[in-house]
Regions:
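Small-residue-rich helix-interface/hinge motifs
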Residues: 46-112
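Alpha-helical adaptor scaffolds
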Residues: 235, 239, 258-300, 305, ...
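Hydrophobic transmembrane alpha-helical segments that form the core helix bundle
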Residues: 110-201
Length: 366
C-alpha cells in the first residue's frame, strides 16, 4: 500500500512541477511569446523529443564536469543504450549496452579518497540539475522561440524532478548522503566498485576485508545506497563459484527486501532464475520469477548473462541440454555486450563453467 501511495505521490509531484514550471516560464516569457511566429505542431513534437534527449546528455555532462572539478576521474558516460567508457590503459570506447531500468543516462566516476567520513559529493550530485537549469536559461535568452521555450521547460522539469528527493534520483542521493556517514561511505564504495569493474577487477575480491567492515556498519534504516552493499557479498561468492551461498543470499534479498529499487530487484530475480533452475529445477519460484513482466523484458536483452540464465533453465528445467549448449554459444558471441570488463570476464567464466557441466552430464549418459 505504501508503495502505491508513494508512486501516486511521485506522479502528482511530477505533474505539479510540470504545471508550475510551465506556468512560471509562460508568464516570464509572455511578452516575447506575443511577438513570436506561431509554431508548427509536428515541429514542436520533434523539438520535444530532441530537447529531452539533449537534456539527458546535458544532465550527465553536468555530473562529469562538476566531478572533474572536484577531483573525480572519468569511468563511463551512458545515454540510453549508448555507452562511452574507459577501460585498461585509459582506452576509451563507444558501444551499445543494456540500459538501466529507471534511468535515461548515467555518468559514473571514481571519487577522491574519503576523509573524516566524507568526500566531495555535493557538486558531483548537483551537477546534472545545475547544467539543466543553466542551459535552459541560456538557450532561451540567446534564441527566444516557442521551440527554445519548450527546450527550457523540459530542462526545468527534468531539473526539478531530479532535485526533489524521490525514488533513487540525485536529490534523494544528496539527501541520504547528508543524513549520515554510513550512507556517504556506502555511495563512495559503490563508485569505487564500479571503477574497479571497468578495469576488469572486483574490488571486494581484491580487498575481502571490506566485507567485515560492511558488517560492522550501523545501518539504522535501509535504502538503495546501503542495499548495494548486499550485492558486494554476492559478487564475492559469485567470483569464487560458491553458487549455493550465492543462491542463499539472493533468496534472502528477494524475500526479506521486497522494496528493493527496480534495477536491483530485476538483478536479484533473474539471477535467482539461473540458480534456482540449477539447484531446485522443480521449484514453483522459477515460474513466479519468469511471470514478472520486468524480468521478461530484461531477459530479452542481448546480454551474455541472459544467455547463461536461459541456458541453465533450458538444461535443468526443460531437460534440453543441446539447446542449452546452443544458447551458451550465442552468449559467447556477444561477450562484447557485457556492461563492463569485469562482467565480461565473469560472463565468459560462467559460460565455460555451465558448458562443462552440461557436456559432462551428456558424456556420462553415453
Amino acid at each position: 500500500m505504501n508503495k502505491v501511495l508513494n508512486g501516486i505521490f511521485q506522479f502528482v509531484v511530477i505533474l505539479g512541477v510540470g504545471f508550475c514550471g510551465g506556468y512560471v516560464l509562460a508568464n516570464l516569457a509572455k511578452d516575447k511569446i506575443v511577438s513570436l511566429q506561431e509554431p508548427n505542431f509536428l515541429l514542436l513534437v520533434l523539438a520535444a523529443v530532441i530537447s529531452f534527449v539533449l537534456h539527458i546528455i546535458i544532465h550527465e555532462a553536468g555530473h562529469l564536469v562538476f566531478g572533474l572539478l572536484t577531483g573525480y576521474k572519468f569511468v563511463s558516460f551512458r545515454v540510453f543504450n549508448v555507452l562511452i567508457d574507459k577501460e585498461k590503459n585509459d582506452k576509451i570506447r563507444l558501444r551499445t549496452v543494456q540500459g538501466v531500468d529507471g534511468t535515461g543516462g548515467q555518468c559514473l566516476m571514481s571519487p577522491p579518497k574519503i576523509k573524516n567520513g566524507t568526500f566531495p559529493f555535493k557538486l558531483y550530485l548537483a551537477g546534472g540539475v545545475t547544467f539543466n537549469i543553466i542551459f535552459s536559461g541560456l538557450v532561451w535568452l540567446i534564441a527566444p522561440s516557442f521551440y527554445t521555450l519548450l527546450f527550457a521547460l523540459i530542462g526545468i522539469i527534468l531539473a526539478l524532478t531530479n532535485a526533489i528527493p524521490m525514488g533513487f534520483n540525485d536529490g534523494m542521493s544528496m539527501k541520504l548522503c547528508l543524513q549520515n556517514e554510513v550512507n556517504r561511505s556506502a555511495i563512495h564504495l559503490s563508485l569505487i566498485v564500479n571503477y574497479y569493474a571497468t578495469q576488469g577487477k572486483s574490488y571486494v575480491v581484491s580487498y575481502p576485508e571490506v566485507l567485515e567492515e560492511i558488517k560492522k556498519l550501523d545501518i539504522n534504516e535501509r535504502n538503495y545506497i546501503t542495499d548495494f552493499l548486499s550485492f558486494m557479498e554476492i559478487e564475492y561468492y559469485q567470483d569464487k563459484f560458491e553458487l549455493e551461498k550465492v543462491h542463499d543470499l539472493l533468496l534472502k534479498l528477494y524475500y526479506e527486501n521486497p522494496d528493493l529499487i527496480l534495477p536491483y530487484k530485476i538483478e536479484v530475480m533473474r539471477s535467482l532464475i539461473q540458480l534456482t533452475s540449477l539447484f531446485e529445477p522443480n521449484s514453483n519460484l522459477i515460474d513466479e520469477l519468469l511471470a514478472n513482466k520486468n524480468v521478461k523484458a530484461r531477459l530479452k536483452a542481448r546480454e551474455p548473462q541472459n544467455k547463461t540464465i536461459l541456458a541453465v533453465y533450458e538444461w535443468r528445467v526443460k531437460n534440453n541440454p543441446q539447446k542449452a549448449l546452443a544458447i551458451l554459444e550465442e552468449g559467447r558471441k556477444i561477450l562484447h555486450r557485457s556492461p563492463h570488463l569485469y562482467a565480461k570476464i565473469i560472463d565468459e567464466k560462467y559460460i565455460n563453467y555451465i558448458e562443462s557441466l552440461i557436456t559432462s552430464e551428456i558424456e556420462q549418459k553415453i
